[in-house]
Regions:
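N-terminal ligand-binding lobe of clamshell/alpha-beta domains
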Residues: 1-255
Length: 255
């Protein structure tokens, strides 16, 4: 069996063209299908909502941070695909003792392209992966380069958590023309006083993981009257697979 190196610099022995794949990451599930691998995908998480209806046809092996190891064992996977941030490492450590586990570690669009290329290599779909990367690259090239203004992007309500540097969302915010005012890396907690002091032009409330709604817009708008507060599609800012094809069109449609 050939050896491959994943994005955590782990060398994995993976069979040529694996036939029983489990995806532990929603964006990668969609990517695998778009690479033509739906028939070889046997297991996914309860959060793998795209493509619609796929969960009814496949085995749900739990969530991204709680795996049902008995269900995984019953599927007899010859490849499991995960992510450093989205999956819990204790579970990954147990899985990699029994199965080939390929992990991604993504902070930028370039990392996402490397991941797509890597999955193409380990699944025998390199040509399809290259076409997808080319399509996304071409689309991104037409993204307006103008600055929209300063922004804070929230992913959680209580405690209030924002997106900082060293995250994929931070990279995509910059590509969308936003200047992220949050300087602390990863996902720092903020207070309302912090938000008022930052005084962003835009307060972006993500649809996931916390499901911000119109009532939250109203709450923040009352506290930050000079800031334009709006809901944004978290999938379009945080999913780093084939959904990137829709990023430019979505961003250009934002108010």
């Amino acid at each position: 069996m050939p050896f491959f190196t994943d994005q955590m610099n782990r060398t994995i022995d993976i069979p040529e063209k694996p036939q029983r794949i489990i995806s532990l990451v929603p964006s990668k599930t969609e990517l695998l299908v778009d690479l033509g691998l739906e028939d070889r995908l046997v297991g996914l998480t309860k959060f793998c909502v795209h493509p619609k209806g796929l969960k009814k046809q496949k085995t749900i092996i739990g969530g991204t941070k709680n795996f049902h190891f008995d269900k995984i064992a019953a599927l007899q996977p010859d490849l499991i695909i995960g992510n450093k941030e989205e999956n819990y490492q204790e579970g990954i450590a147990l899985l990699e003792k029994k199965y080939p586990v390929w992990m991604s570690d993504i902070y930028t669009l370039e990392d996402a392209f490397e991941m797509i290329k890597g999955i193409g290599a380990i699944t025998g779909t390199a040509a399809q992966a290259e076409r997808l990367i080319h399509e996304i690259n071409q689309d991104m090239a037409f993204l307006s380069q103008g600055a929209r203004g300063t922004a804070v992007y929230l992913i959680w309500k209580d405690p209030m958590m924002a997106v900082g540097p060293q995250t994929f969302i931070h990279d995509m915010l910059g590509r969308a023309g936003f200047i992220n005012l949050v300087q602390e890396p990863r996902y720092p907690e903020l207070s309302m006083e912090d938000l008022k002091n930052l005084s962003p032009d835009f307060l972006l409330l993500s649809s996931e993981p916390f499901p911000f709604k119109q009532k939250h817009i109203d709450e923040f708008a009352a506290q930050l009257p000079q800031t334009h507060t709006q809901l944004v599609d978290g999938e379009l800012f945080s999913w780093y697979g084939s959904r990137l094809r829709y990023f430019r069109e979505y961003v250009e449609g934002l108010n």
